[in-house]
Design a protein with these regions (language model features):
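Cysteine-rich, disulfide-bonded extracellular modules and peptides in secreted proteins
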Residues: 21-125
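C-terminal motif of bacterial Sec signal peptides marking the signal peptidase cleavage site
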Residues: 17-19
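Bacterial N-terminal signal peptides that target proteins for export
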Residues: 1-10
Length: 125
């Protein structure tokens, strides 16, 4: 039987212009993302900056109006963005599904093969 989940291959958020010099744990207002490093984004959630790893090959990139965080190589136990809650991605070896639950990626299924097509995660037992 095939199990399907929505894929969260990348996180897209608003670019916050006041993001310079911010660190995880610092206070913030509203919501959105900034790139702290090439492989790390910060998300303003609940009035506090929280780290979100961007382990995929595209890392964390800021454009004129958005921040893109490539989460395609993130691991179980990594933080995930609030916009990814309930969504999944394939583990980097293609043998499991990771799903964002309460702000943390959890391994939810083992697979012989996991693929993402058109935003849909398919896990073959």
């Amino acid at each position: 039987m095939t199990r399907s989940f929505l894929a969260a291959v990348s996180v897209v958020g608003s670019l916050l212009l006041a993001g310079c010099g911010q660190s995880a744990g610092d206070s913030c207002e509203g919501g959105g993302f900034i790139c702290q490093e090439d492989v790390l984004a910060l998300e303003c959630r609940g009035g506090v900056w929280r780290e979100v790893p961007c382990r995929g090959p595209l890392g964390c990139r800021e454009t004129d109006d958005a921040v893109r965080c490539d989460t395609s190589n993130n691991r179980a136990g990594d933080a995930c963005a609030s916009s990814a809650e309930g969504k999944g991605l394939c583990r980097s070896d293609g043998r499991a599904v990771l799903e964002c639950r309460q702000g943390v990626l959890e391994e939810t299924a083992s697979c012989s093969a996991c693929t993402v097509t058109g935003g849909q995660v398919t896990c073959r037992p």
